[in-house]
């Protein structure tokens, strides 16, 4: 995404909608400017960062303060016209220099704490996701140089109150908000406009002559395909939660092969015949896992443990501990079966494959041998 693309509005029903930036971008900018102030020993009132999507943001700094080896600064969250629970709040960073040579990151007031497994962060750690952790540490390192150390604290005085309007508590994130954002940019878009934009990408791929397409829920899937399967990123299209819609569009456009690749947290819903995977439509993840574990002869204690889990990752720990890893191949096959059932009235349906991977990019299961799927996609 270029800077010009960021400045351009998103149009919906004739109305121009303004883009915004994530809590991760706010935390990164606040940490960067605090580090610069403590190095230069004077106040700074504007800072620029480059987001993971390549957009340069120039942001106003609020409440800057520097004293000795410590500085504090804040950035106000702006979600554009996609107003959420964190819109308008201040995200602070406090940077304290030291001689350790290392950069340590911690969450302070108003930043949630991870209390359950299953969201890709260690239990007891602050709810600062992987991409913001990386961008914060990189920005501070650039500011302080290669040899100094720093302690970075991210905090949000309104965080406890704002978090009550989010799903954090249901995910086991307690005491505040999460610092998130894979791209650093918030793009406002209605569901229909969003679906149409995804379909347009399919049309572009097909017009370029592609007959095989990989559908992924989001950025994590794109990285897995690129890094673990060696597949050309040009073959990958994001389907978001709109699995059924994107499959139907791929059929309409004449793709001969569809490969669904993603984390079980999204894709196992398809095994239950759920083709819109947003949680406000349907969930049934634990019910699906329990049903298919039972089909494989899993004992009641394991079924009970899985049924009581809040996240797929937590359930997977029990599944792996009990030695039922074969469930993942079984689910991948079931996903393909469900897709073909959905397309049963299509005259020449495409072939379908499914691949499931973990948060740490390990292959969990596939409908066919992974090498065979990858080979077909690269030929």
Curated annotation (Swiss-Prot):
Keywords: Cobalamin biosynthesis, Methyltransferase, S-adenosyl-L-methionine, Transferase. It is an enzyme of class 2 (transferase). The keyword Transmembrane does not apply. One of its GO terms (molecular function) is cobalt-precorrin-5B C1-methyltransferase activity. Gene3D superfamilies: CbiD-like (3.30.2110.10). One of its GO terms (biological process) is anaerobic cobalamin biosynthetic process. It catalyses: Co-precorrin-5B + S-adenosyl-L-methionine = Co-precorrin-6A + S-adenosyl-L-homocysteine. Pathway: Cofactor biosynthesis; adenosylcobalamin biosynthesis; cob(II)yrinate a,c-diamide from sirohydrochlorin (anaerobic route): step 6/10. InterPro entries: CbiD, CbiD_sf. Pfam families: CbiD (PF01888). Its EC number is 2.1.1.195. PANTHER family: COBALT-PRECORRIN-5B C(1)-METHYLTRANSFERASE (PTHR35863:SF1). Belongs to the CbiD family. HAMAP family: CbiD. This is Cobalt-precorrin-5B C(1)-methyltransferase. The lineage of its organism: Bacteria, Pseudomonadati, Pseudomonadota, Gammaproteobacteria, Enterobacterales.
């Amino acid at each position: 995404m270029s800077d010009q693309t960021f400045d351009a509005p998103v149009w919906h029903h004739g109305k121009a909608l303004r883009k915004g930036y994530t809590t991760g971008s706010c935390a990164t900018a606040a940490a960067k400017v605090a580090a610069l102030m403590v190095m230069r020993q004077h106040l700074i009132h504007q800072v620029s960062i480059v987001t993971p999507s390549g957009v340069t943001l120039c942001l106003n700094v609020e409440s800057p303060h520097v004293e000795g080896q410590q500085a504090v600064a804040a950035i106000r969250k702006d979600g554009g016209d996609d107003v959420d629970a964190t819109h308008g709040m201040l995200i602070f960073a406090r940077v304290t220099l030291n001689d350790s040579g290392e950069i340590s990151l911690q969450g302070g007031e108003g930043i949630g704490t991870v209390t359950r497994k299953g969201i890709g962060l260690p239990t007891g750690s602050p709810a600062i996701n992987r991409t913001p952790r990386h961008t914060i540490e990189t920005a501070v390192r650039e500011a302080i140089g290669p040899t100094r150390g720093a302690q970075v604290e991210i905090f949000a005085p309104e965080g406890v109150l704002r978090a009550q309007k989010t799903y954090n508590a249901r995910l086991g994130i307690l005491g505040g908000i999460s610092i998130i954002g894979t791209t650093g940019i918030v793009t406002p878009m209605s569901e229909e406009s969003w679906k149409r934009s995804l379909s347009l990408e399919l049309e572009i791929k097909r017009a370029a002559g592609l007959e095989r397409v990989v559908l992924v829920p989001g950025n994590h899937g794109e990285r897995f395909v690129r890094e673990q399967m060696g597949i050309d990123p040009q073959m990958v299209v994001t389907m978001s939660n709109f699995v059924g819609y994107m499959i139907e569009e791929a059929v309409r456009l004449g793709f001969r092969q569809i490969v669904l690749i993603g984390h079980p947290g999204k894709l196992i819903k398809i095994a239950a015949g759920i083709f819109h995977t947003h949680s406000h439509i349907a969930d049934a993840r634990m019910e699906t896992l329990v049903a298919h574990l039972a089909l494989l002869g899993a004992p009641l204690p394991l079924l009970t443990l899985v049924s009581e889990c809040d996240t797929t990752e937590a359930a997977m720990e029990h599944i792996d501990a009990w030695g039922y890893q074969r469930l993942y191949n079984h689910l991948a096959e079931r996903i393909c079966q469900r897709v073909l059932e959905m397309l049963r009235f299509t005259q020449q349906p495409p072939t379908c494959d499914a691949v499931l991977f973990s948060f740490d990019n390990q292959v969990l299961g596939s409908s066919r041998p992974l090498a065979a799927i990858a080979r077909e996609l690269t030929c």
